[in-house]
Swiss-Prot record:
<comment type="similarity">
    <text>Belongs to the universal ribosomal protein uS15 family.</text>
</comment>
<dbReference type="InterPro" id="IPR005290">
    <property type="entry name" value="Ribosomal_uS15_bac-type"/>
</dbReference>
<dbReference type="GO" id="GO:0019843">
    <property type="term" value="F:rRNA binding"/>
</dbReference>
<keyword id="KW-0689">Ribosomal protein</keyword>
<keyword id="KW-0687">Ribonucleoprotein</keyword>
<dbReference type="GO" id="GO:0022627">
    <property type="term" value="C:cytosolic small ribosomal subunit"/>
</dbReference>
<dbReference type="GO" id="GO:0003735">
    <property type="term" value="F:structural constituent of ribosome"/>
</dbReference>
<dbReference type="GO" id="GO:0006412">
    <property type="term" value="P:translation"/>
</dbReference>
<dbReference type="InterPro" id="IPR009068">
    <property type="entry name" value="uS15_NS1_RNA-bd_sf"/>
</dbReference>
<comment type="function">
    <text>Forms an intersubunit bridge (bridge B4) with the 23S rRNA of the 50S subunit in the ribosome.</text>
</comment>
<keyword id="KW-0699">rRNA-binding</keyword>
<dbReference type="Pfam" id="PF00312">
    <property type="entry name" value="Ribosomal_S15"/>
</dbReference>
<comment type="function">
    <text>One of the primary rRNA binding proteins, it binds directly to 16S rRNA where it helps nucleate assembly of the platform of the 30S subunit by binding and bridging several RNA helices of the 16S rRNA.</text>
</comment>
<comment type="subunit">
    <text>Part of the 30S ribosomal subunit. Forms a bridge to the 50S subunit in the 70S ribosome, contacting the 23S rRNA.</text>
</comment>
<protein>
    <recommendedName>
        <fullName>Small ribosomal subunit protein uS15</fullName>
    </recommendedName>
</protein>
<dbReference type="InterPro" id="IPR000589">
    <property type="entry name" value="Ribosomal_uS15"/>
</dbReference>
<keyword id="KW-0694">RNA-binding</keyword>
Length: 96
């Protein structure tokens, strides 16, 4: 389920490192987290939508890889992002 432009803009302004930042790991993880939460809500209603479930698993894996990258590059930014989004730290492959 794609995000609309207003939601993307709001997420970018909230998590951007500087003006016009669209590609930092923080922004990417925040957008993926929003899509994951939207798909999770969809799957609560539509339990047999296996195509969307596969898409959800792909998004979760992509977010996990981005979090692993951020934890390896800058652990303080990783911890701040995880706390801000309310993600379990185990989501990044055990980086604590």
């Amino acid at each position: 389920m794609p995000l609309d432009a207003a939601t993307k803009k709001q997420i970018m302004s909230e998590f951007a490192q500087k003006e016009g930042d669209t590609g930092s790991p923080e922004v990417q993880v925040a957008m993926l987290s929003r899509r994951i939460s939207d798909l999770t809500e969809h799957l609560k209603t539509h339990k047999h939508d296996h195509h969307s479930r596969r898409g959800l698993l792909i998004l979760v894996g992509q977010r996990r890889r981005l979090l692993q990258y951020l934890a390896k590059k800058d652990i303080q930014r990783f911890r701040a992002l995880v706390d801000r989004l309310g993600i379990r730290r185990g989501a990044a492959g055990g980086a604590k």
